[in-house]
Structure formats: C-alpha cells, structure tokens
C-alpha cells in the first residue's frame, strides 16, 4: 500500500494556508481603504465576507479529516494492505509501478486520505481506484478545494459498471447498481429497530439445461475474516427460523421458494420474494474490529428427484440432494466504505467449481470465493438489500414463514366450523365486527327502489355483470378498462372501493359467490374460469380452470364450495373440484348433453337440481345431489332428469336462467325479447314482454321475496313486472345509460338494486327505496283526489315511489279517474283500450331498437338530440289502492306514444341464394320476401322471412319490391316469379295488417292460443308472426308515461 510522508502532509497544509493568505492581504488593504474614504466601504465589506468564508472552510476540512481517524485506524489499513499485496501478486495484468514508502503516523494517514479524495474527484467517472485506498464521505469530498490537479495515471479502460466491492482490477465479481441511488454510509444507519431484508428479484435467462426445472436461491451470511457464518448479535434471538435452538449462535442460511418452470410456463426465473433475517441491521454494517465483515453469498440450486440420486452416484455426495447451478457474492460494505443497500443490484453469476475441495467447518461457497478461480456464468442475479422495520403484530400462521411469525395449529373440525360460518365473521371486510342494520325486515316483501343512492366507477369500458354477496356487504363488478378486465369489489352500503382482482385477459361473462362468501368464481372469454379468495390482502388468482374456448357461465354448488360447474362454447358442462389443500383444480366430470354452446347454469337452493340452457333453446334439468363427505363420488352419479324443448323458443338462445325463490318455478330469459317464468311441475310458462333483447347477453333477476322481476333492455331502460300477474309495474326510463343494460342485481337484505351497462364510461348505478319519497307522493295524491287533471303541477321525480331519482326533473300530470261500474260492456271497453295502449308501446320500442340495437353502430355523438322529456299521468284511485295495500298492489308505469300512424317495415325480395355462416345470420333463397327491421350498415340488414326466422342478410343480395317490379327481364329470370299468395301479401293494405296485430295481441293477453283460420292458411300465420316481431321492435317516438292499475 502506498504510504504518505510528512513532507507530503506539510505540502497539503500549505495548500490549505494558501487560500487564507489572500484573505490577510485583503484585510490590510481594507484598513488602508478605510482611512482613504467612505466610498470604499463596499469593497471592504466584500473582502471581510471572503475572509470569514475561508476560515469556515478551514474548520470544516479539519473536522472532516479528524473523523476519518475513527473509521480507518492504522492497523486496519496495514491489514488490508497485506491482503491487497497478496492478491496483486496473483494478477497477470501489468500495473504501473508505485515506489514503496515508509509507514506513517495517524495524522499522515488523514492528510493522505484528503489528497486521495482530491485525485478521486479529478479522475473521470466510472474509473477504478486502487484496492485498499482510504476514502472519505462524499460530503467531505465536496468541501475539499482543488488547487492542484493530480498527475494523470495510465489506466486500462473497462466496461461501464459501478464496482462497489470489486477486489480485482479485471472486473471479476462486479456488482452493478441498476437503480442509481446515492451511496449510503453505515454511519447513517444506526436505527436498532431495523432488520436485514434481502429481496430476490429475478435472474437473466439461465443457460439452457433440461435438468433445471424449479430453481431456487439460497442466501448465506458469512464473515470474511473467519470464513464462517456470521455470529448473532444476541445469541438468544431467532434470526432465520421461529424455532431456532438456543445453541445456534450464528445466522443460518435461508432459501426462497422454488420457481416451477412447468407450472408458471416461463424459463425466466422471477422469484420476487422478500427474505427477512431477524438480525440487527446496523450490527452487520459496522466497521469495527469486533464486528464481522459481512459478505452475502447467493447460490442458485435445484433439488434432485429420488431416482436421480439413486441412479447417479455423483449426486449422492452432494449436500442435501441439490444440483448447484451458479453462485454470486455481495459485500455489504464496498471497498470505498459505502454500503450496497437500498438499491437494486445486479450481481455477476459464476459456475461452481467442478471438483470442490470441501473442508470441515468451512462454508463451501466461501471456499469457492477465496481459493477457486472464478468462471463467469452467462447470466446475472438481481437483488436488493435494505433495512426493514418489523411490524408490531404479526398474525400467526399454520406454518411459520419467517423468524417473527408464530406457528399455531388448530383442529380440523374447528377450522371447518369457522370457515363455514359467514354470519359472525364477514369475509373480506376490515370492519367485519361492525354490524349493519338493514331496513328491510326478514320476510317482508321487496319494494321498488325509487331514490338514486350513488354511482360507482366501472372503468373506461363499463361493467358486464355484477352480483351482491350473500351477506350483502360486498358488490362484485366485472369491469373493463384499457389495461385489462378487473373484478372490482365495493363495500356496501358505503360504496367504498375495496380492491381489484386482476387476471382475466378478456370480457368476463359471469360471476358467482360461494355460499359462505369466501370465494368468488368468474368466467371469461379468455378461455379460463378463475376462483378468487375473498380476503383483505388477496388480489391474485387462487385457482385457474382452463377451457378450450370461451367460458360463458360458472356456478358454485350450493351444498359445497369445493365444486364449480362451468358452461363452455364447446357445448360441454364441466365439474371441477377446487380444494384449498391441493395445488390445482381437478376436473371431475364432463357432461355433453347439449348440442350448442351453454349460456347459463343455475341451481336450486338445496343443490338437488341444476338447470342449463344453450343457444338453441334447450334447457336440461339435472339431478345433482352431493354428499359433502364424498364429493367426487357423488358427482359421478349426476344424471339428466329431463329436457325442456318448448316450441315457442325453439332455436332461440337462452341468455339467463334463475330459479324462483319458492323452488318450483324457473325464470327463462331468451333472445326473442321475452321473459318467461315456467312452472316446473306442469311446464306452463307466463310471458313478460316489453324489454327488447335480440342480440346482447342480458341478465334479469328476481327479488329475494319473488314478488318483483327486473330486466334490462337494449334500449337502455329497466323494466319491472309482477311475476304473479304478469303486469308491468314500473319502468326506469331516464337512466343515464347509452348502451344496453347488461345485468341487474337486487340486494339480499335491503330494498336496493344495482344496474350496469357495458359501454364507454358507463357507471354502476345503485338505487334504494325511500319511504319518505313514497309518503310525499301519497299526500299529493290525497290532495288532488277526485279532481280534474291539473297540467300545471310540476314535482320532483323523487315524489313518485316507483320512479328513480334522476338528474333531470319530469313533469307530473294528475288526471281524474272515474270508478267504473260493474257492467261487462264497460270492462270490455277498458280492456280494449288497454290493449291498444300496449300495442302502441311495443311499436315505439321497436323503432328505437332499429336505431340503437346494432353492436357495430357508433356511439351517439354530441350532435345527437337528447331524449324527449317524459311526464307521468297519475290516476288517483289506482295510486290510493297502491298505498292502501302496499304488500300486494303494484304500480304499472307504461309509455304511450303520440297518436300518429306507424309506417309498416319495408319489404325486399331476395335476388340470390345465401347460406348463413353464423348463428345470427339468415339463410335466404331466390324469390324470398324479407321484412327489413333495421339496417345495421350498408352491407348487412336485419329482417325476418315471416316463418319465425330472423337474422342478418347481405344487402347486395336483395332488392325492394318496386325495384323488383321495374327490373329488366334478365334480372327477373334469375329470380323465380312471385306466387299469387306472395303478391296478395305484398298488396295487402296496412289497415288489415293492423287489425291482425290487434287480434293477435288480444288473443295472447287473454292467455289463449291464436285461432287457426283455415281459409287464410299458412301464409296468414307467417304474416301474423312477422307483425308481432314488428311490434316488438318499434320504440323510438317521443312518449309519455301513464300510471294505471287494472284490478
């Protein structure tokens, strides 16, 4: 080591005095200037300030140099010099000869350190200085004046890297800091509350080796002086394990979890694991003689199978049956005195020696570092070392994962009992002990929510489906954003954001809670169904259920949360066993009864029966009884009970199925704009019309009491019916949705409902029933009871109990309602008026769907005209009846269009044959007459053949009737001539069509089947079906709403 002479120290002191000399001269000049005149006072003041600054600099330099004596005693310097000289003898590269100098006193060492820092600042950035050279803190370096330039030295250029503890000039063992932070001196880390944490990030791609399948990292904490593991600061303190024995007085090594290439489908190891050593962190960073000089060694290992150990004798001698892949090292304190902590470091990996010379009582990896040549491995390891503050309370676990975590076990029956009870402890909530008092009493009939509660964020693209948990405390929403498709959990009733569950790569079609609300299952078009744990800190996927195609539905079995049933695009129903004690989900059975893709699955409350619906209108009923003690054996005995194939919706996709709360009826939502509730005993169904649904997947729902039916629509309106009578009792027509309302969920314990839509920036809306709003309405109706209509009354929409609170106010018009006499003629007249009103409503709905139904149509722009203001026409006697019997009576809110003639849909004639290539397309033949419902774009139109067949067809394959008549003979020859019946159908006046519509609807309302007219034949039935579809598609004219009640 190069030593400094007293002459050199004196020269350094003269350099320091050199700056103070101009200050003395300036003081004499200042005194002379003061005698000359007051005009030179300013110059004298400046000189005085410069003198004081020079004195401060001298004091600061002396203080910094004295501090170095405490950190670099002469014995340590001599010891390091000897070690460095031994290693320099082994180097093959040439170095510039440095003349030897005699030993110096401690003061000489301080001056030498000061001059070394001046040379260091003058050197270019990234250069490597001699090993063993003393360095001071960076603050002292910045304060040392540079009056003289150091002599240039010839140095070999090296790759740009930050060498913190490099012991050789050739760069072996370079530790590169990827996150450039300012160096940390151990002096700054004197907080005794910190423990050492080593974060293992990842490696670069490892060398291709088929024998490496699940690598892991083993971390050793070794003392450089002794070659042994570092002694504990407190021998009784557990450092690596919670159950360390008292006789273990050193720090045991710790290993990370293995990274399974096959399971994680990646050959780039990314552990991202925090390893905690419960040792005093400042103790490992001190530089005193009695403190250890710590080196961290990292071994990348892979465990061997028993067959490999038995068949290969070379493996039998290796430690613990591990295959050693590579190793790296890191000094906590570098050669420059700075600590390699609080930043991400990149460590060079080395091959382990082929024939290691293992000695007893010596750490093997330390022998590799100190005595064996280092052969670089073509990869690096990324780590971060930092001090961690231990939390005050660490929750015990069944298996301790760190030295601070207690291991506590409980009997199996206690664990199952606690997990199955969801009343006392509500899962996934931080304030689970806080009880929420719901307003709806047990057994009380549900009310129609009439007040807007709040809106929730659903991402940039809206929400596709949502569902309340069984305890009512969490709302799960399957949303879509620019970056992915997260499941967002909101706390109810506060609406507070809880967490996001990220993992799906495409639209989430369905979600379902387990019976105890501890698990959530979702199905997506990315080909997977995922099971999530409902825990406070759990945001990753618990189990993944892979499928060959889109997964449309997924449900937990009500009897056990270990069974998950999924419906897929490949027409298969799969039953999975999801057990927390096993690593992966098990596919128990596949059911292949359906001939088309399965859209919906549901269970009854006991789980004895399962119902599945597909795309061609077939509903299968299954016997699904399960024994909790033997789940897999019970699934093998599942059988199909019967298949429901109704002619009314044959070939129509089933969008959603739900069992009525009484367990004897089934809600069937199909894509023909009709909802049905079927009695499962006699298979008789009641229809509910009004909601438009021809293309989108929409979910409807029944309230927990079974007295209300909610359904969304493609026109952005929510419809409410009474399932017992089939009457439409309410309608949310002013919701701020621009897209189809996809899903509705009613709260299990509160008169609360949630709506969602899948579209650009569509929110999640929550409405709640407010008794005060209903009471204000009742008082208003009593005041105007029996009077003539008062068109000038304007009230807030909150005043109507069945209408939600909206951002705009609507006008309410009170009409007189005269009690009718009990004569049959008067009743028939009212029924006819009622039917005419509903007929006009359906036509108005169809017109609106013509404009907004297409999924490929662009969103409404800013130039689009706003929806016309709607008003309510309240009938007095009917509303009084509603409030007189609130449990049984329901309000019917309907829309009445302005009385104007409705043009019939245009008719076109097919010029060429076309075969449908998708399920939503229409197969046409030459000469077919097609009724056009709407034009999706210039190339594709939507229409019906009049045979109950509807779908899209190419616009260039058809021509209008007038163009067909005027077309040249060559074109007509390519198409067959129209039959007399088809010509009569085309020439039939609109008035007769209207009468057919009215008769057809009258028959359906009275519950009777349409009468077959033999004289009109088959073509007339086709005509009636076509007009019915036309009525259900029209809904665009400006409308008013009328509140009526038919007893």
UniProtKB/Swiss-Prot annotation:
Show the Pfam families listed in the entry.
Answer: SH3_1 (PF00018), WD40 (PF00400)
Q: Which controlled-vocabulary keywords does the entry list?
A: Cell junction, Cell projection, Cilium, Cilium biogenesis/degradation, Cytoplasm, Cytoskeleton, Developmental protein, Differentiation, Phosphoprotein, Repeat, SH3 domain, WD repeat
- What InterPro entries would the database entry show? AHI1_SH3 (IPR035832), Cilium-Associated_Jouberin (IPR052803), SH3-like_dom_sf (IPR036028), SH3_domain (IPR001452), WD40/YVTN_repeat-like_dom_sf (IPR015943), WD40_repeat_dom_sf (IPR036322), WD40_rpt (IPR001680)
Q: Which GO terms describe its molecular function?
A: identical protein binding
Taken from the UniProt record, the cysteine pairs bridged by disulfide bonds within this chain are: none
User: Biased composition, Basic and acidic residues: where in the chain?
Assistant: 1-17, 77-86, 116-132, 173-185, 964-1003, 1012-1040
Q: Where is this region: Disordered?
A: 1-44, 67-185, 964-1047
- In the UniProt record, does the keyword DNA repair occur? no
**What would be one Gene Ontology cellular-component term for the protein?**
ciliary basal body
Mind listing the GO biological process terms from this record?
Answer: cell surface receptor protein tyrosine kinase signaling pathway; central nervous system development; cilium assembly; cloaca development; embryonic brain development; eye photoreceptor cell development; heart looping; hindbrain development
Where in the cell does this protein reside? Cytoplasm, Cytoskeleton, Cilium basal body; Cytoplasm, Cytoskeleton, Microtubule organizing center, Centrosome, Centriole; Cell junction, Adherens junction
SMART domains from the UniProt entry: SH3, WD40
Domain SH3, first and last residues per copy? 903-963
Annotated signal peptide: none
Q: Is-annotated flag, keyword Repeat?
A: yes
Q: Which positions does the entry assign to WD repeats?
A: 458-500, 503-542, 546-586, 593-632, 649-688, 692-731, 736-777
- Show the PANTHER family listed in the entry: JOUBERIN
Task: Quote the protein name from its UniProt record.
Answer: Jouberin
The record lists the organism as Rattus norvegicus
Gene that encodes the chain: Ahi1
């Amino acid at each position: 080591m190069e030593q400094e002479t007293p002459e050199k120290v004196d020269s350094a002191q003269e350099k320091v005095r050199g700056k103070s000399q101009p200050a003395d001269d300036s003081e004499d000049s200042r005194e002379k200037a003061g005698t000359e005149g007051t005009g030179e006072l300013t110059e004298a003041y400046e000189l005085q300030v410069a003198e004081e600054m020079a004195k401060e600099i001298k004091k600061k330099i002396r203080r910094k140099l004295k501090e170095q004596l405490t950190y670099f005693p002469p014995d340590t310097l001599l010891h390091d010099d000897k070690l460095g000289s031994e290693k320099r003898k082994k180097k093959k590269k040439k170095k510039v000869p440095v003349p030897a100098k005699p030993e110096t006193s401690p003061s000489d060492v301080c001056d030498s350190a000061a001059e070394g820092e001046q040379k260091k600042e003058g050197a270019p950035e990234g250069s490597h200085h001699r090993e063993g050279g003393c360095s001071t803190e960076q603050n002292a370096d910045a304060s040392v004046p540079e009056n003289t330039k150091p002599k240039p030295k010839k140095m070999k250029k090296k790759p740009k890297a930050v060498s913190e503890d490099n012991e050789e000039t050739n760069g072996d063992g370079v530790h590169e800091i990827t996150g450039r932070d300012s160096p940390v001196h151990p002096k700054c880390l004197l907080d005794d509350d910190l423990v050492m944490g080593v974060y293992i990030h990842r490696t670069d791609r490892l060398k291709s080796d088929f024998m490496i399948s699940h690598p892991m990292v083993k971390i050793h904490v070794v003392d450089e002086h002794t070659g042994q593991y570092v002694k504990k600061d407190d021998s009784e303190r557990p450092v690596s394990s919670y159950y360390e024995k008292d006789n273990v007085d050193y720090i045991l090594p710790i290993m990370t979890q293995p990274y399974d290439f096959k399971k994680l489908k990646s050959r780039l190891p990314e552990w991202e694991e925090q390893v905690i050593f419960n040792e005093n962190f400042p103790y490992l960073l001190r530089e005193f003689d009695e403190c250890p000089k710590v080196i961290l060694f990292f071994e990348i290992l892979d465990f061997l199978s028993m067959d490999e150990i038995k068949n290969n004798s070379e493996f039998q001698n290796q430690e613990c049956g591990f295959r050693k892949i590579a190793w790296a090292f890191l000094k906590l304190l570098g050669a420059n005195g700075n600590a390699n902590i609080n930043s991400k470091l990149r460590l060079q990996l080395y091959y382990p020696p082929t024939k290691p010379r293992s000695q007893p009582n010596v750490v093997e990896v330390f022998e590799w570092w100190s005595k064996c040549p280092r052969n670089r491995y073509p990869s690096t390891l990324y780590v971060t070392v930092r001090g961690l503050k231990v939390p005050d309370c660490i929750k015990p676990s069944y298996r301790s994962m760190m030295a601070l975590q207690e291991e506590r076990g409980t009997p199996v029956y206690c664990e199952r009992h606690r997990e199955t009870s969801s009343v006392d402890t509500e899962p996934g909530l931080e304030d689970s002990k806080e009880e929420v008092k719901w307003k709806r009493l047990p057994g009380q009939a549900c009310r129609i929510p009439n007040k807007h509660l709040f809106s929730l964020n659903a991402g940039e693209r809206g929400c596709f489906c949502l569902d309340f948990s069984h305890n009512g405390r969490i709302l799960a929403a399957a949303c879509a954003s620019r970056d992915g498709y997260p499941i967002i959990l909101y706390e109810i009733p506060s609406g507070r954001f809880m967490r996001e569950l990220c993992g799906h790569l495409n639209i989430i079609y369905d979600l379902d809670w387990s019976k105890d609300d501890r698990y959530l299952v979702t199905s997506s078009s990315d080909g997977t169904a995922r099971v999530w744990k409902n825990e406070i800190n759990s945001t990753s996927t618990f189990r993944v259920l892979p499928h060959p195609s889109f997964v449309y539905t997924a449900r937990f079995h009500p009897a056990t949360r270990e069974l998950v049933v999924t419906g897929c695009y490949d027409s298969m129903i799969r039953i999975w066993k999801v057990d927390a004690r096993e690593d992966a989900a098990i596919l128990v059975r596949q059911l292949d009864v359906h001939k088309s893709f399965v859209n919906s699955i549901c269970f009854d409350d006991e789980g004895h029966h399962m119902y599945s619906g597909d795309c061609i209108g077939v509903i299968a009923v299954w016997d699904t009884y399960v024994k909790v003690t033997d789940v897999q054996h019970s699934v093998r005995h599942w059988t199909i009970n019967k298949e429901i194939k109704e002619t009314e919706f044959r070939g129509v996709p089933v969008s959603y199925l739900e069992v009525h709360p009484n367990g004897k009826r089934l809600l069937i939502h199909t894509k023909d704009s009709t909802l049905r509730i079927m009695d499962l005993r006699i298979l008789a169904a009641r229809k509910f019309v009004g909601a438009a649904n021809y293309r989108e997947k929409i979910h409807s729902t029944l309230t927990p009491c079974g007295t209300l039916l909610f359904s969304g629509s493609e026109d952005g309106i929510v419809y409410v019916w009474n399932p017992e009578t089939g009457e439409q009792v309410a309608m949310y027509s002013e919701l701020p949705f621009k897209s189809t309302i996809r899903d509705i969920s009613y709260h299990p314990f509160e008169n609360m409902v949630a709506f969602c839509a899948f579209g650009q920036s569509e929110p999640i809306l929550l409405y709640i029933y407010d008794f005060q709003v209903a009471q204000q309405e009742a008082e208003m109706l009593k005041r105007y009871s029996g009077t003539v209509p008062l068109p000038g009354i304007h009230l807030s929409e909150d005043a109507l109990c069945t209408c939600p609170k909206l951002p705009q106010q609507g006008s309410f018009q009170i009409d007189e309602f005269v009690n009718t006499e009990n004569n049959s003629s008067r009743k028939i007249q009212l029924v006819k008026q009622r039917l005419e009103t509903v007929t006009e409503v359906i036509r108005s709905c169809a017109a609106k769907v013509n404009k907004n139904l297409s999924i490929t149509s662009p969103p409404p722009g800013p130039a689009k005209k706003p929806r016309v203001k709607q008003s309510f026409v309240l009938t007095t006697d009917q509303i009084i009846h509603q409030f007189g019997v609130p449990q049984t009576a329901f309000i019917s809110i309907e829309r009445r269009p302005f009385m104007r003639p409705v043009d019939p849909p245009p008719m076109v004639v097919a010029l060429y044959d076309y075969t449908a290539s998708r399920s939503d397309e229409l197969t046409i033949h030459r000469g077919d007459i097609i009724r056009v419902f709407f034009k999706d774009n210039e190339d594709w139109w939507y229409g019906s053949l009049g045979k109950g067949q509807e779908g899209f067809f190419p616009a260039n394959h058809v021509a209008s009737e007038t163009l067909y008549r005027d077309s040249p003979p060559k074109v007509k020859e390519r198409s067959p001539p129209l039959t007399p019946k088809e010509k009569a159908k085309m020439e039939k006046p609109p008035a007769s069509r209207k009468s057919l519509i009215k008769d057809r609807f009258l028959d359906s309302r009275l519950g009777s089947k349409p009468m077959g007219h033999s004289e009109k034949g088959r073509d007339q039935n086709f005509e009636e079906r076509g007009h019915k579809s036309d009525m259900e598609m029209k809904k665009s004219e400006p409308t008013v709403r009328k509140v009526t009640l038919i007893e």
